[in-house]
Amino acid sequence: MIERSGYGIIAASLLLSAVAYLLHPLISALFVGFALFTAYFFRDPERKIGEGVVSPADGRIDYLEGRRLEIFMSPFDCHINRAPWGGKVLSVKFIEGSTPPAFIRKSGVRTNEILIETEHGVFRVLQMAGIFARRIVSYVSEGDVVKKGQKIGMIRFGSRVVLEVPEGFRFVRGVGEKVKAGETVALRDESFQGS
């Protein structure tokens, strides 16, 4: 399955490929290649939702301290982000900022902040744009009720997602580990079962 906003880019690439073929087959092949990359990038695989607090993004954990976990998403990771836990969306706020390369941890970055209120406290998900990831798309609005693993947004063409959690949780993944949105359990609290 492909995320809905990818279809327009794929269609435009294939149309340009047909027109470019009149100029030169090699130019046409470049557009076909871009269409194939776009189809791969905008893929929307089914996920089996994990039992604890789940990762909000696909990628590699590159920072973990206290109650904060950061995930670097390369252009080859699926870029659809998911709710780490079920609850009510308190707010969705876009914060303007710079767009450095996603592998560089930096403050003042273009960010979409999603706060999810749960029975165990507030989860904060930050979708951060990078130099190539210029567009952050949010699928949720203030007041929405989300389920754990539900799609909450997408960052186009690679970047970073941050998860900040309430007190009382312990991370079960470490720096360098690969995670999958909605599927990989990122942290647990043994005192209650998954929402």
From Swiss-Prot:
Enzyme Commission number(s) of this protein: 4.1.1.-
* Active site residues according to the UniProt entry: 159 (schiff-base intermediate with substrate)
Name its cellular compartments. Answer: Cell membrane
Q: How does it sit in the membrane?
A: Peripheral membrane protein
Q: Give the main localization category.
A: membrane
Enzyme kind, highest EC tier: lyase
Reactions this protein catalyses: archaetidylserine + H(+) = archaetidylethanolamine + CO2
An example Gene Ontology molecular-function term: phosphatidylserine decarboxylase activity
Q: How is the cofactor bound?
A: Binds 1 pyruvoyl group covalently per subunit.
Keyword S-adenosyl-L-methionine in record? no
Q: Does the keyword Disulfide bond apply?
A: no
Required cofactor names: pyruvate
Q: Which residues form the signal peptide?
A: none
Q: Which residues are annotated as site, described as Cleavage (non-hydrolytic)?
A: 158-159
The modified positions for Pyruvic acid (Ser) read 159
Alphabetical UniProt keywords: Cell membrane, Decarboxylase, Lipid biosynthesis, Lipid metabolism, Lyase, Membrane, Phospholipid biosynthesis, Phospholipid metabolism, Pyruvate, Zymogen
One GO cellular component from the entry? plasma membrane
Q: Cite the post-translational modification comment.
A: Is synthesized initially as an inactive proenzyme. Formation of the active enzyme involves a self-maturation process in which the active site pyruvoyl group is generated from an internal serine residue via an autocatalytic post-translational modification. Two non-identical subunits are generated from the proenzyme in this reaction, and the pyruvate is formed at the N-terminus of the alpha chain, which is derived from the carboxyl end of the proenzyme.
GO-annotated biological processes: phospholipid biosynthetic process
Q: By its UniProt entry, which Pfam families does this protein fall under?
A: PS_Dcarbxylase
Function description: Catalyzes the formation of archaetidylethanolamine (PtdEtn) from archaetidylserine (PtdSer).
Q: Which family does it belong to?
A: Belongs to the phosphatidylserine decarboxylase family. PSD-A subfamily.
Q: Can you state the subunit structure given in the record?
A: Heterodimer of a large membrane-associated beta subunit and a small pyruvoyl-containing alpha subunit.
Q: Known HAMAP family for this protein? A: PS_decarb_PSD_A
Name under which the protein is recorded = Putative archaetidylserine decarboxylase proenzyme
What species does this protein belong to? Archaeoglobus fulgidus (strain ATCC 49558 / DSM 4304 / JCM 9628 / NBRC 100126 / VC-16)
Give me the gene this protein comes from.
asd
